[in-house]
Swiss-Prot record:
Per-repeat ranges for ANK: 2-31, 40-70, 82-111, 115-145, 149-178, 182-211, 214-243, 519-561, 565-594
Function comment: Substrate-recognition component of a Cul2-RING (CRL2) E3 ubiquitin-protein ligase complex of the DesCEND (destruction via C-end degrons) pathway, which recognizes a C-degron located at the extreme C terminus of target proteins, leading to their ubiquitination and degradation. The C-degron recognized by the DesCEND pathway is usually a motif of less than ten residues and can be present in full-length proteins, truncated proteins or proteolytically cleaved forms.
UniProt subunit comment: Component of a CRL2 E3 ubiquitin-protein ligase complex, also named ECS (Elongin BC-CUL2/5-SOCS-box protein) complex, composed of CUL2, Elongin BC (ELOB and ELOC), RBX1 and substrate-specific adapter FEM1A. Interacts with PTGER4. Interacts with NFKB1; the interaction is direct.
Alphabetized UniProt keyword annotations: ANK repeat, Cytoplasm, Mitochondrion, Phosphoprotein, Repeat, TPR repeat, Ubl conjugation pathway
Encoding gene per record: Fem1a
Protein name in the entry: Protein fem-1 homolog A
Pathway: Protein modification; protein ubiquitination
Modified how: Phosphorylated; highly phosphorylated in myoblasts and myotubes. Phosphorylation at Ser-108 and Ser-608 promote PGE2-EP4-mediated inhibition of inflammation. Dephosphorylated by protein phosphatase 2A (PP2A).
Domain of life: Eukaryota
Record flagged with keyword Repeat: yes
Gene Ontology cellular component list: Cul2-RING ubiquitin ligase complex; cytoplasm; mitochondrion; ubiquitin ligase complex
InterPro entries for the chain: Ankyrin_rpt, Ankyrin_rpt-contain_sf, TPR-like_helical_dom_sf
Length: 654
């Protein structure tokens, strides 16, 4: 173990005497170096603050000159927090004595992490009320500094269910109607976490029932998460039935703080006087809650109970609230339509599958196609069908969800990427199942695979149309890899000449985009790289793949394309010891003597132990023109500007 690591470990374990011994007699510069970051990004002071070793913290600051503001990486609950100052770590862990000590020694009370989280937010997250009181009461910590998502200290306290911290923040003037980047408020966080007491507290402080960026009210948020207690409280009988938002709440006009914050929560107005819920909103909340009971709680009888109440409210007083008529019935939902009468509703009890379709229909109507839960539960239902062997039904639902995601989410959304990967894994399983069972297995058709492959290419096209190109982002690389896996599977399906033509057209669309993955890899580079195999938890295709390489070459992939290290696909194939693929690339016109940034040819990268290296004769593929190009490069003969551009590119290749 080196000295740097030994110092860090001593600070981690709180071994002050050992730490003093390790640092004794060393010069200032050496001590500064030893107190710097270790390989994981942490520092001795940061880890000592995280672990609550007060004596070590004070020794490092007072005797060794460690900076109280030096940030680093620290781990909490399995997550790595980047750019965390020692005060943040001590606050998050609830070590009040260390917090006091660091602040007395000049630590900034509002210093943030890389994600803009303050020490106060860290203390609010895990419910350290004593630390919160000290930071705010003694050092005037800013209550309103939000993290990079616009999420405030009050919001996280509400979400985590820390009632006393929420009460204290409200007493100190926290803005109760502050919105995050996605438009949600502290009320939304209460509704999502099921914290009814805090929700009552916020409502008493004039919290408004606003809609977030997805159009969700706190009432709908409670329905989506299945918190029946919140839903029941918010839809209780009101003296009047106003709108959920957009109307002035009592008291707002007379008091400036009514819509902002509440200084005395104990004197809060009762809920009934400030936030009435309309009949329509109550109906939707109950219907959505029923859908949650079906898909999340898997309680069909509980769902039916909530849907009955919603139906009663729709017909209340003879003033019927009709459901909107669907524009068209959906194949993925088995052409189901929402029930509209009590008789139709009661008939569902004999048809559990129809109840599940009702849940999907209700969720799509109320939340809309852009809400993540809509497509998530469609995919979930499809997965349940797949688990029971009903692959056709699964594929229909997943295709519908994928169309929804591509039409409503940004390109390369993690949810869309997950859909593509799920398709690839499902298709791989079905093909293996068919191979094992013969005619008894499901017949996976060309249209199924081709449809998803085409949508995958469309996703790449959408990503490349963004103002900022994705470059070598991991998500973009994964998207290309999944397309190659789908192509790998498609090669296992028999095609007619017209289907073969359609497949080649789609691959040509991909190549025309000229997408580049990690390290500037083209699709052809990725097809000859074994790393492309690792795309998900389950194996789909095996790479390098000669079949995929041949399809790419047939569709016009450039065998001499270069990555950021000037490697051609031939170089990558050689690094992966694939002589058969090298032969295919050479036959397609790849230059055997092309050199990379390290002046190595593909032949030189081949494993010398391979029999193929001894049988492969590079001079069989080298022309006089190639030898001349290498001679010019080797002898540093100036040629740029003196010869045609095509020849310049040819020389640079060598």
């Amino acid at each position: 173990m080196d000295l740097h690591t030994a110092v860090y470990n001593a600070a981690h374990d709180g071994k002050l005497l050992l730490l003093q011994k390790l640092l004794a007699g060393r010069g200032r510069e050496e001590i500064e170096e030893l107190l710097g970051e270790v390989a994981g990004g942490g520092t001795p002071l940061l880890i000592a603050a995280r672990r609550g070793h007060l004596d070590v913290v004070e020794y490092l600051v007072d005797n060794c000159g460690a900076s109280v503001e030096a940030s680093g990486s620290v781990h909490f609950d399995g997550e790595t927090i980047e750019g965390a100052p020692p005060l943040w770590a001590a606050s998050a862990a609830g070590h009040l004595a260390v917090v006091r000590s660091l602040l007395r020694r000049g630590a900034s009370v509002n210093r943030t992490t890389r994600t803009n989280s303050t020490p106060l937010r860290a203390a609010c997250f895990d419910g350290h009320l004593d630390v919160v009181r000290y930071l705010v009461g003694e050092h005037k910590a800013d209550l309103e500094v939000a993290n990079r998502h616009g999420h405030t200290c009050l919001m996280i306290s509400c979400y985590k269910g820390h009632r006393e911290i929420a009460r204290y923040l409200l007493e100190r003037g926290a803005q109760v109607n502050r919105r995050s980047a996605k438009g949600n408020t502290a009320l939304h966080d209460c509704a999502e976490s099921g914290s009814l007491e805090i929700l009552q507290l916020l409502l008493g402080c004039h919290a408004r029932m606003e809609r977030d960026g997805y159009g969700m009210t706190p009432l709908l948020a409670a329905s989506v998460t299945g918190h029946t207690n919140i839903v029941e409280y918010l839809i209780q009988e009101q003296p009047g039935h106003g709108q959920l938002s957009g109307t002035e709440l009592p008291g707002e006009g007379s008091s400036q703080m009514a819509g902002n914050h509440c200084s005395t929560p104990e004197e809060a107005e009762p809920y009934e006087s400030c936030c009435p819920t309309s009949r329509e909103a109550a109906v939707e909340a109950l219907e959505l809650l029923g859908a949650t009971y079906v898909d999340k709680k898997r309680d069909l009888l509980g769902a039916l109970k909530h849907w009955r109440r919603a139906m009663e409210l729709r017909h209340q007083g003879g003033d019927y609230l009709p459901k909107p008529e669907p524009q068209q019935l959906v194949l993925a939902y088995d052409y189901s339509r929402e029930v509209s009468t009590p008789q139709e509703l009661e008939a569902l009890i004999t048809d559990p599958d129809e109840m599940r379709m009702q849940a999907l229909l209700i969720r799509e109507r109320i939340l809309g196609p852009s809400h993540p839960d809509t497509s998530y539960y469609i995919r979930y239902r499809g997965a349940v069908y797949a688990d029971s062997g009903n692959f056709e039904r699964c594929i229909r639902l997943w295709k519908y969800a994928l169309d929804m995601q591509q039409n409503n989410l940004e390109p390369l959304s993690p949810m869309t990427a997950s859909s593509f990967l799920s398709f690839a894994e499902l298709f791989s399983y079905v093909l293996q199942d068919r191979s094992a069972k013969g005619n008894l297995g499901m017949q996976l058709g060309f249209a199924d695979l081709m449809g998803v492959l085409s949508k995958g290419v469309r996703e790449v096209e959408r990503a490349l149309q963004l103002p900022k190109e994705p470059g070598d982002s991991a998500q973009f690389t994964k998207a290309i890899a999944i397309i190659l896996h789908l192509l790998y599977l498609l090669e296992k399906v028999e095609c007619t000449p017209s289907q073969e033509h359609l497949k080649h057209q789609t691959v040509y669309r991909l190549l025309k985009c000229a997408p580049r993955g990690k390290n500037g890899f083209t699709p052809l580079h990725m097809a000859v790289d074994k790393e492309t195999t690792n795309v998900g938890r389950y194996r789909v295709g095996i790479f390098p793949s000669l079949q995929v390489v041949k399809v790419l070459l047939d569709c016009g992939a450039d065998p001499d394309s270069r990555d950021f290290d000037n490697n051609t696909p031939l170089h990558v194939a050689a690094q992966n010891n694939c002589p058969a693929i090298m032969d295919a690339l050479i036959e397609a016109g790849a230059h055997m003597d092309a050199t990379n940034a390290f002046k190595k040819t593909a032949y030189e990268l081949l494993d010398s132990k391979l029999l193929a290296k001894s049988t492969m004769q590079p001079f069989n593929y080298v022309t006089l023109q190639c030898l001349a190009a290498r001679a010019l490069d080797r002898n540093k003969v100036p040629y740029k500007g003196f010869i045609p551009e095509e020849l310049e590119a040819f020389i640079q290749l060598h």
